[in-house]
Amino acid sequence: MVKTVDDLQPGETAIIKKHSVSGTLGKHLREMGLINGIPVKLERRAPLGYPVEIKIQGFSLALRKEEAKAIELE
């Protein structure tokens, strides 16, 4: 089973293995530091579960469900 950002619990940290977000959004995520080998921490989930807030390289980023499920972790 592949672990994704969607599987993390608040406060949990993991290392990015890869992501399958394509197109312009994928490019923006890579530019913001979502690249292989970088640690990512799940800060919190919205009351209904999405979006999720992650902390990566010192800044916070909100991800939709589809994006969180597309980021695979080690």
Features from the language model and the residues they span:
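Compact, glycine-rich, soluble single-domain proteins
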Residues: 1-74
